[in-house]
């Protein structure tokens, strides 16, 4: 009888420990689903993706993750794709709710100083004017750029407090567009001049912070975009949650 009681106690202990340490597969799946969902934008958005056309060739390797981000946007979103070139904004895809078509409009940047703009902010302002009026979607512009403005000199004031940057900020505020930016070096000054990098990143910080967006960069060199897109989605979701 004593042996039977001892055996029963051992079995009961094993069941208790086993039950406490195993999470049902359904619960694990739900937990994993919540984690994945937190890296995707949860509410429809009007998104303009602007890429500076003289960025280093490595930016071309980020087209896949950029396209995946676009295709993963929620139903009801619209996307525009454009390239910032010397003196012009090349709109590859006007705003469309066909996310696959928008993703397909991405192309590898020219990656040459022949395409270098004096600054990206004239074309940013032009793109802001193309956002659809009205509607319930939030308006966001993703600027992939080195941020550098040399149109009126090469010093901190001319680059970070430039006329065109200030005009872009005013236009964004008037039209309710938040600017988010990913830093990447260009084939020009920001590929070798640390002061140019500092000016460009500071300008991206300004245009993003003053329009309710956020700038993403790490150090002074090129960083792949995977982590940036995860943080961008998280930021959009957090800001969207506060807005509703």
Tell me what each language-model feature is.
Residues 53-57, 85-90, 99, 109-116, ...:
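Solvent-exposed loop/turn segments at secondary-structure junctions
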Residues 1-11:
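Bacterial N-terminal signal peptides that target proteins for export
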Residues 34, 45-48, 64-67, 100-180, ...:
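Exposed acidic/Ser/Thr-rich ligand/metal-binding surfaces
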């Amino acid at each position: 009888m004593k042996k039977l009681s001892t055996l029963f106690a051992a079995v009961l202990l094993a069941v208790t420990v086993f039950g406490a340490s195993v999470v049902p597969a359904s619960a694990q799946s739900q937990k994993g689903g919540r984690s994945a969902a937190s890296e995707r934008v949860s509410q429809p958005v009007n998104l303009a993706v602007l890429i500076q056309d003289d960025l280093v060739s490595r930016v071309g390797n980020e087209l896949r993750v950029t396209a995946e981000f676009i295709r993963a946007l929620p139903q009801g979103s619209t996307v525009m794709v454009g390239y910032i070139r010397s003196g012009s904004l090349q709109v590859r895809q006007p705003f469309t709710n066909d996310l696959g078509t928008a993703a397909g409009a991405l192309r590898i940047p020219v990656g040459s100083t022949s395409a270098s703009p004096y600054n990206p902010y004239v074309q940013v302002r032009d793109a802001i004017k193309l956002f659809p009026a009205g509607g319930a979607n939030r308006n966001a512009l993703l600027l992939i750029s080195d941020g550098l403005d040399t149109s009126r000199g090469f010093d901190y004031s001319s680059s970070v407090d430039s006329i065109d940057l200030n005009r872009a900020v005013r236009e964004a505020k008037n039209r309710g567009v938040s600017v988010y930016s990913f830093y990447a070096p260009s084939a020009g000054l920001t590929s070798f001049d640390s002061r140019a990098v500092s000016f460009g990143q500071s300008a991206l910080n300004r245009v993003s912070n003053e329009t309710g967006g956020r700038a993403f960069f790490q150090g002074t060199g090129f960083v792949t975009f995977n982590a940036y897109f995860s943080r961008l989605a998280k930021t959009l979701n957090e800001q969207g949650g506060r807005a509703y």
